[in-house]
Amino acid sequence: MNFKNRTFKIFNTTYKLKFVDNIESEDNNSTVLGTTDSSLKIIEIRTKDKLGKVINKNDLYITLLHEIIHAIFIEGQYLQANQDEPLVEWTAKCLKHLIDQKLLVGN
């Protein structure tokens, strides 16, 4: 996976994917790894931890999948599922596991 800024579509909606060093959080005790802004159609993925160390690729990939799943639920109007963080995280981890087994690959 090439972790660089790009755009992609979920059906007819274009999202901008941005990889950033830091994502500001209202809670200083937590670290936000990713965000999905449904009004601006922007997904941000944090690439460095609080100490400035690069986050490993596996965690970046799961975070990317997690945020894409949020966008999928939002675009499909599955707003209750979108708010279910354990469901979103579980789905992301399951997809990553299937991708690692090369069950889900591009053409």
Feature names for model-found ranges:
Residues 63, 67-71:
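Catalytic glutamate of the conserved HExxH
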Residues 2-58, 71-75, 79-94:
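Active-site scaffold of zinc-dependent metalloenzymes
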Residues 100-107:
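Short, Lys/Arg-rich amphipathic alpha-helical interaction segments
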